[in-house]
């Protein structure tokens, strides 16, 4: 029996009244696309309407924190504020220290961003040692050895927006 992974939610959350932003990097696009698709499908199953899922891109994972902040601000300025945002990126270790620097700085920046934007920022950054690990965590490896983590991020987005979003209190 596996003990890892997201546990079952304490209830089913209705996402029909929330607006979700997804901002994703373009590096490792096959994996990114699968993760985004998983998040969208899971949110749709929880009632989030397709027209309330807004998608934006940035070049790479390092650009996610700044891009996310600007994305959130722009939606608010347009009078269509988001309730939650999911930055999605995939980092795969190579032979240099690049992986460590980008993983660490991006993780901390995304964590700190929640206070700046005053909304839940779901951690959608895969940090994998190999391409095979990334494919597995996107649910697209040949053996289908794992589920798509994008589904977890979509479920977390709905739960956090409903429980703790601006309209929750």
Swiss-Prot record:
Pfam families xref list: DMRL_synthase (PF00885)
Signal sequence annotation: none
Induction trigger: Is constitutively expressed at moderate levels.
SUPFAM superfamilies: Lumazine synthase
Residues at the active site: 98
Pathway: Cofactor biosynthesis; riboflavin biosynthesis; riboflavin from 2-hydroxy-3-oxobutyl phosphate and 5-amino-6-(D-ribitylamino)uracil: step 1/2
CDD domains from the UniProt entry: Lumazine_synthase-I (cd09209)
Catalytic reaction equation(s): (2S)-2-hydroxy-3-oxobutyl phosphate + 5-amino-6-(D-ribitylamino)uracil = 6,7-dimethyl-8-(1-D-ribityl)lumazine + phosphate + 2 H2O + H(+)
Catalytic activity, EC: 2.5.1.78
Subunit (UniProt): Homopentamer.
Family label: Belongs to the DMRL synthase family.
Note: Present with 3260 molecules/cell in log phase SD medium.
HAMAP family: Lumazine_synth (MF_00178)
Name assigned to this protein: 6,7-dimethyl-8-ribityllumazine synthase
Source organism of this protein record: Saccharomyces cerevisiae (strain ATCC 204508 / S288c)
